[in-house]
Amino acid sequence: MPPRKRCDTVFGMAHPWWVNLLIVVPFTSYLFWRREPVLITRAHLLASALFAASFGMVEGTVVVYLRAVLAAAAGYGASVFAVAQFSRNFNPAMLQSAVLPISLLRVEVCREAATMLMLITVAHLGAHSRRGRWAIFLWTFAIWDLTYYVTLCTTIRWPSSLTAADVLFLIPIPWISPVWFPLLVSTLCIAAVLHSRRSILGHGVTDA
């Protein structure tokens, strides 16, 4: 795989350039919902939040194991302490070098695809309308993402700063950005869904 440009953690630019467009998703979704509020009950929000938080912890744990493989290959060892030390020196370019065998990289791509399918399935089951399903998807994705980083922080003390570079996704090519970027997008997505739900309660919809 040819080397790719690292993200500029000083200015917060993600790569490829179109990854930066994710910041508009919560804003455009909120404007879309203002025209016609989505119908999501408290029970659906709670159930999907519990799923997302649990799944985020599983996702974070899997990444700890993946980094243990990378740490062992780089000579750090495979203990939690070694993984934490390796993570402090983690560079997204490591995923594009011989450190990670191409066979494992393909497995990781398949895992990411399965993750998206699971989140889409939960969104489909959690609402009946397209608006509602989109809201549930953003809600679960955001909570999953935040819990993922909380899991990494509590287990291997990573990221050490919000400007640390991270690989967000590998499909179709690696998405690289500073950690603060996905945290901001996820927080805004949660805020957009919650604010829209307040609008729902104001429209006389029964909350259950």
Kindly give the residue locations of the regions a language model identified.
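Alpha-helical transmembrane segments of integral membrane proteins
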Residues: W18-V19, A43-A47, F51, R111, ...
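Transmembrane alpha-helix/helix-exit interface in multi-pass inner-membrane proteins
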Residues: G56-V69, A142-S160
